[in-house]
């Protein structure tokens, strides 16, 4: 029986580090990239007698997330100890939430192949992050433990098994990431581990009512790896079933170098963690007034912003989706459009440059919009140079690349690099006459109906003028000279 006769069933558990200045239960910094164990104290080191104190900002960010995702905010929630042993967990337990999480229900809506899909949520709960094992830190191959991350606040967002393909899982995660970034609760950086995703994957024969045995997949720090891991795991489980072998419930690790999953440990059930209420923390009471205040402060969310871009600015669903995928990029786009001009034509121009050339440059450098030397005003100035015929499209790309690298003003770059177009009809006409005289055969073919040769002539004229001829003037003169 081929894999097409099976249905893959996926649920995701997304761990999002919250953008607080300090950890969830102590005052240590959450800043990424410090020397190992620089941001630690008796609380996050798990020393005897050290007591946790809840960071209020964590509760507010959890409520903010829950409201944006349509969850029920529980007026009373409780922290619990999740007991397990691992070197990066100094207390021997993780403070999390179990029976009474802060948020329940909710959903995430995403678009795939032009259709909207919705995945329901089970819950959102608060918890502390663990530390990080660092291997081969010495010549003898010894491993170390960096506890800077221990105690960094997380929300875990748990979906129901509503996803039915690797592509759906990727689009769900993209939509959720965009929401978290728009809320300002998470930076969306999967490479640094501030947004992590585990996938629960099972397969069942199409038409069956009972779900198959699930395996949890870890170590996926990109959308590409999430897709690869789910697709491999689904194939692996189908092959086991077809061979008459059982699928064992377990936790598996994705190996990005080999593009496959491998067994990590047997999958634990809740009772294996011996959850019990955290005795050192009181219940979390969330008052209705706080919920309503946070509800009133919610920003425009990505789907609403994308719909506004399409409705008010005439952008395509594709362009709007690309812009709202990153809240910082969409805010930059709004500022650039305000600097350049209003209307659908202006919006399309700005969107093309933001999602095209600027996105390419940003991907090469890894810079966020806040660090771009191309400010919204500088992009607007570049586009005005194009509108005025001072530079063409290729010249504008050169200008933006230089501005992105140096922060120079666009008009100064045009002058320094000699990028200004020639619009003088006399100069262009001389080049046109020279090209037509050098290619009489092609000119006759054009006049005989081979109209596609116009591009050839334009290219030859631009070559003659070293790329500086105004394309509109070049085209007009060629058509006139060729008898159009």
From Swiss-Prot:
The keyword Methyltransferase does not apply. Its EC number is 6.3.5.-. It comes from the Bacteria. SMART domains: GatB_Yqey. One of its GO terms (molecular function) is ATP binding. Gene3D superfamilies: 1.10.10.410, GatB domain, N-terminal subdomain. InterPro entries: Asn/Gln-tRNA_amidoTrfase_suB/E, Asn/Gln-tRNA_Trfase_suB/E_cat, Asn/Gln_amidotransferase, Asn/Gln_tRNA_amidoTrase-B-like, GatB, GatB_C_1, GatB_Yqey_C_2, Gln-tRNA_amidoTrfase_suB_CS. One of its GO terms (biological process) is glutaminyl-tRNAGln biosynthesis via transamidation. It catalyses: L-glutamyl-tRNA(Gln) + L-glutamine + ATP + H2O = L-glutaminyl-tRNA(Gln) + L-glutamate + ADP + phosphate + H(+); L-aspartyl-tRNA(Asn) + L-glutamine + ATP + H2O = L-asparaginyl-tRNA(Asn) + L-glutamate + ADP + phosphate + 2 H(+). The keyword Cytoplasm does not apply. Keywords: ATP-binding, Ligase, Nucleotide-binding, Protein biosynthesis. SUPFAM superfamilies: GatB/YqeY motif (SSF89095), Glutamine synthetase/guanido kinase (SSF55931). Allows the formation of correctly charged Asn-tRNA(Asn) or Gln-tRNA(Gln) through the transamidation of misacylated Asp-tRNA(Asn) or Glu-tRNA(Gln) in organisms which lack either or both of asparaginyl-tRNA or glutaminyl-tRNA synthetases. The reaction takes place in the presence of glutamine and ATP through an activated phospho-Asp-tRNA(Asn) or phospho-Glu-tRNA(Gln). Heterotrimer of A, B and C subunits. Belongs to the GatB/GatE family. GatB subfamily. This is Aspartyl/glutamyl-tRNA(Asn/Gln) amidotransferase subunit B. It comes from Anaeromyxobacter sp. (strain K). The lineage of its organism: Bacteria, Pseudomonadati, Myxococcota, Myxococcia, Myxococcales. The gene is gatB.
